[in-house]
Curated annotation (Swiss-Prot):
Residues 148-342 form the CheB-type methylesterase domain. HAMAP family: CheB_chemtxs. Involved in chemotaxis. Part of a chemotaxis signal transduction system that modulates chemotaxis in response to various stimuli. Catalyzes the demethylation of specific methylglutamate residues introduced into the chemoreceptors (methyl-accepting chemotaxis proteins or MCP) by CheR. Also mediates the irreversible deamidation of specific glutamine residues to glutamic acid. Its EC number is 3.1.1.61, 3.5.1.44. The gene is cheB1. This is Protein-glutamate methylesterase/protein-glutamine glutaminase 1.
């Protein structure tokens, strides 16, 4: 039985979330909290397996509440937010940065896709309740040992020009992508194509959040747009993203792959067909296996492939699947991924 604490100041939304979660026999709502302060008390008293968190709470907002919980009693947290409210979107991504695992749009009984959102909530609660979260934001500073990782490529042996970097991520991906992009310099020359699994409606806010951290433009991909050096492009809601040999973005409403659209597998396959060995594939934290097999094909084509290491992955599903099939040339934490990409961008044959 999965024990859930609902943190939400709206009685109507609290009741709706409780109704949805109680419809599954494997889930039990053990408590509700109307404010951040109450949530902090209830999480200690009830010890839930998972928390659903609103971001707009009286006095202490969802970001600060998430930060405090991850500092004091780490617990899996799903942010349940309104995608159409810009202030909520901003707080949502700050909460992800503080340690929340995922974001879902608030369900509405009047919405046409109510049944889909209800199923998504139940599915997310079941999946995220199994994630082992770690303590964050310690009051007392301490020095953490660097996580183990394999060595970085010997850039001196690489003499080809890399035309594009393709990245895929799911659960835990937003903060990792933010770290990698913010660690790349403003003169980074390789275009980056990104697929991040995310609830529909949040991609524009996600891109805006990323662009404020990055040192170069980050935008939602547009069909037919030519990819440019020093730019990052994020796949939009509900469309597979690929690229052709002319360097133009191709968006298509195809069947889901691995149950997902956009799919990392689709992006990776498109990239190795268009660029062969002159591309880099990066598979980051995430649930499932999207992109793992295609990363193996990339490596077999002679491409540089990178998977995030287990120690820094929120969920080791996608990179773990890839590593298990020997699909990764290098297994690295996010900060080393950024350093390797910088070196690859400068590794052009004279």
């Amino acid at each position: 039985m999965i024990k859930v604490l609902i943190v939400e100041d709206s009685p109507v939304v609290r009741e709706l979330l409780s109704h949805i979660l109680h419809s599954d026999p494997q889930i039990r709502v053990v408590g509700v909290a109307e404010s951040g302060e109450e949530a902090l008390k209830e999480v200690v008293r009830l010890r839930p397996d998972l928390i659903t968190m609103d971001v707009n709470l009286p006095r202490m907002d969802g970001f600060e509440t998430t930060r405090r919980i991850m500092e004091e009693i780490p617990t899996p947290i799903i942010i349940v937010s309104a995608a159409w409210v810009s202030t909520e979107v901003e707080k949502t991504f700050r909460a992800l940065e503080a340690g929340a695992l995922a974001v879902l749009e608030k369900p509405s009984i009047a919405a046409r896709d109510y049944d889909i959102r209800a199923r998504d909530l139940i599915r997310a609660v079941k999946a995220m309740s199994e994630v082992k979260v770690i303590r964050r934001w310690s009051r007392s500073p301490r020095i953490e040992p660097a996580p183990p990782a394999s060595g970085e490529p010997d850039i001196g042996k690489i003499t080809k020009r890399f035309e594009v970097v393709a990245m895929g991520a799911s659960t835990g991906g937003p903060t990792v992508l933010k770290q990698i992009l913010s660690d790349l310099p403003d003169n980074f020359t390789i275009p980056i194509l990104i697929v991040q699994h995310m609830t529909q409606g949040f991609i524009p806010g996600f891109v805006d959040w990323l662009s404020r951290a990055a040192n170069y433009p980050v935008s939602v991909a547009v069909h037919g747009e030519e990819i440019r050096p020093g730019h990052a492009y994020v796949a939009p809601d509900g469309l597979h993203m690929g690229v052709n040999a002319l360097g133009k973005i191709i968006l298509t409403k195809g069947e889901p792959e691995n149950g997902l659209c956009p799919s990392v597998s689709y992006l990776f396959r498109s990239v190795y067909r268009a660029y062969g060995e002159n591309a880099v594939g990066v598979l980051l934290t995430g649930m499932g296996k999207d992109g793992a097999y295609e990363l193996k094909v990339m490596k077999d084509c002679g491409m540089i492939t990178i998977a995030q290491n287990k120690e820094t992955s929120v969920v080791y599903g996608m990179p773990g699947e890839a590593i298990g099939m020997n699909a990764a040339s290098y297994v690295l934490p996010p900060e080393k991924i950024a350093r390797v990409l910088v070196k690859l961008a400068g590794s052009v044959a004279p």
